[in-house]
């Protein structure tokens, strides 16, 4: 399914020689990002409905299953089928019997909005999850970050067309981009990338995201054992607390030649 459509719209603007707006009924062609409800169905039982871009949904299903703790490893999933239905898309996931039994014990239904929200959470004390503390297995040369930022920007093909999507990319320790995923929801883009990361053998490196660093972005990164998250915008206080607790290197406001290091500075050098 295509991730963008063309549509004729009305627009307004000021001309160079006047402070007045031109007529509101001028028309132009615009490109809109496609946003569609995607139902994640485990062994025939609907678990979650998320608003997504309709691409790379197998990777999304794998990443979501990992970051939500439904599975521990890709091998816990026996098969994934993407099926278009009349009002959206169903991603049909076949879990191992053991994982499906565990899921049924605390199955919940939810409707997400552009990938936001703590998925399937009913009580406040379920929000704050604890994971094993991340080991420090590498150091990253901050001088390489500028080229990574350039690569992130120029490879956001859907974002360049529509201006309506987020991107998450994975870079190795030499600053080479290994994968990039875009979606209308930043959490969904991250789940897609983490699905790729898991099925690719968990290469060492870091995630660069076009969004802010929210608590859930940090939680998903930590859950999949990635040691470093860099974002274009700021981090929230809870995201920083989560990063510090789990020894995640977290950088925000990443720009050419600068950035805020919120936690995990021992992985960085210049």
UniProtKB/Swiss-Prot annotation:
Location in the cell reads: Cytoplasm
Please provide an example of a Pfam family that matches this protein in its UniProt record: FdhD-NarQ
Where Mo-bis(molybdopterin guanine dinucleotide) binds, per the record, is at 253-258
Q: What does this protein do?
A: Required for formate dehydrogenase (FDH) activity. Acts as a sulfur carrier protein that transfers sulfur from IscS to the molybdenum cofactor prior to its insertion into FDH.
HAMAP family given in the database record: FdhD
By sequence similarity, the record places it as follows:
Belongs to the FdhD family.
| Name of the protein in question | Sulfur carrier protein FdhD
Q: Which organism is it from?
A: Haemophilus influenzae (strain ATCC 51907 / DSM 11121 / KW20 / Rd)
Taxonomic classification, please? Answer: Bacteria, Pseudomonadati, Pseudomonadota, Gammaproteobacteria, Pasteurellales
């Amino acid at each position: 399914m295509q991730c963008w459509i063309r549509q004729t719209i009305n627009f307004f603007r000021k001309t160079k020689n006047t402070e007045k707006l031109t007529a509101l009924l001028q028309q132009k062609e615009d490109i809109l990002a496609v946003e569609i409800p995607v139902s994640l169905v485990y062994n025939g039982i609907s678990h979650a409905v998320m608003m997504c871009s309709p691409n790379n949904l197998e990777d999304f299903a794998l990443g979501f299953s990992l970051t939500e703790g439904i599975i521990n490893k890709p091998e816990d999933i026996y098969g994934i089928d993407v099926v278009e239905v009349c009002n959206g898309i169903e991603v049909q996931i076949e879990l191992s019997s053991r994982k499906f039994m565990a899921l049924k014990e605390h199955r919940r239904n939810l409707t997400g909005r552009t990938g936001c929200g703590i998925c399937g959470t009913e009580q406040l004390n379920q929000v704050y999850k604890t994971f094993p503390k991340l080991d420090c297995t590498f150091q990253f040369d901050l001088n390489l970050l500028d080229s990574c930022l350039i690569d992130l920007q120029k490879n956001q093909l859907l974002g360049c067309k529509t201006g309506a999507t987020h991107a998450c990319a994975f870079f190795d320790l030499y600053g080479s981009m290994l994968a990039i995923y875009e979606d209308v929801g930043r959490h969904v883009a991250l789940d897609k990338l983490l699905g790729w990361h898991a099925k690719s053998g968990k290469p060492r490196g870091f995630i660069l995201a076009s969004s802010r660093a929210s608590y859930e972005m940090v939680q998903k990164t930590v859950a999949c054992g990635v040691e470093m998250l860099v974002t274009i915008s700021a981090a929230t206080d809870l995201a920083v607390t989560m990063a510090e607790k789990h020894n995640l290197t977290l950088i925000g406001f990443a720009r050419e030649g600068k950035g805020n290091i919120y936690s995990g500075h021992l992985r960085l050098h210049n």
